[in-house]
């Protein structure tokens, strides 16, 4: 199920810029294994969901998965073949702003071999370079 905020204060946001490294959400909090971002990017709610599904499918019933990022930034897109001007486009999809060091997914309750494979499948769905890390 794609996630997006139930309600926001404003419909549209500035694009902003991704400077520096992530100081929040860069430590393992819930599970034992995690996937950590190494590059700055926007990760869409579809990509987050694809990674979550891949991990869940590989791990089957065993283990628990935590998604540590949430898409809370609306991205606007203008209709195709529209002339310049006449305001900003309408919100099309949601993204999560990810900086280097940010934990994307965590996993626990499975062996390291299973976790490594499940997380590598999820990593292949991400648009950036990532690394597998172990708590400790």
From Swiss-Prot:
It comes from the Eukaryota. CDD domains: Ribosomal_L16_L10e. Keywords: Chloroplast, Plastid, Ribonucleoprotein, Ribosomal protein. One of its GO terms (molecular function) is structural constituent of ribosome. GO terms for biological process: mitochondrial translation. One of its GO terms (cellular component) is chloroplast. It is found in: Plastid, Chloroplast. Pfam families: Ribosomal_L16. Its main location: plastid. The keyword ATP-binding does not apply. Part of the 50S ribosomal subunit. NCBIfam families: rplP_bact. Belongs to the universal ribosomal protein uL16 family. This is Large ribosomal subunit protein uL16c. It comes from Buxus microphylla. The gene is rpl16.
């Amino acid at each position: 199920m794609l996630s997006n905020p139930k309600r926001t204060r404003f419909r549209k946001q500035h694009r902003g810029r991704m400077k520096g490294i992530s100081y929040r959400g860069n430590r393992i909090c819930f599970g034992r294994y995690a996937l950590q971002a190494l590059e700055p990017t926007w990760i869409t709610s579809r990509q987050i969901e694809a990674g979550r599904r891949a991990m869940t499918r590989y791990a089957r019933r065993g283990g628990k998965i935590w998604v540590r990022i949430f898409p809370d930034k609306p991205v606007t897109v203008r209709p195709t073949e529209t002339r310049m001007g006449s305001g900003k486009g309408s919100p099309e999809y949601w993204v999560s702003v990810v900086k280097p060091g940010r934990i994307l997914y965590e996993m626990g309750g499975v062996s390291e071999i299973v976790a490594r494979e499940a997380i590598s499948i999820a990593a292949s769905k991400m648009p950036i370079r990532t690394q597998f890390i172990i708590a400790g």
